[in-house]
Amino acid sequence: MSDAPHKTLHQILDPDGWKPARGYANGVAASGRTLYLGGTIGWNGQQEFESDDFIAQTRQCLQNIVDVLAVGGAGPEHLVRLTWYITDRDEYLARLKEMGAVYREVIGNHYPAMAMVQVMALMESRAKVEIEATAVLP
């Protein structure tokens, strides 16, 4: 295992000889109190969409995660896993730079283990992104 270039409260798992992951971790080892967040979409606390824009929904979705973490006494630095579900791979790829900026704005320079999955649709018809999160407090 080698140390990844980003700082984290948990141990980043990168096998020797592997090219470092960019924007995520290959694996994370953590122990402590675990918080499991259900699928979070890009609507506000009143369950209303303020935008149909992919980036705006992503920002709101990430902020929703931060808000739920705070209730559990955690912050973005405690995240160990994010699973993203998106409805449009092409839009994601075309707007990757904006996605990165929004991620860093809300979450910071913390990159847990992540997976990104394209789905045909999400349960809320206006939703373009949904994220499940797991966090561990030491």
Regions found by a protein language model. Give the residues of each.
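N-terminal presequence-like segments and the immediate start of the first folded domain
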Residues: 1-80, 86-138
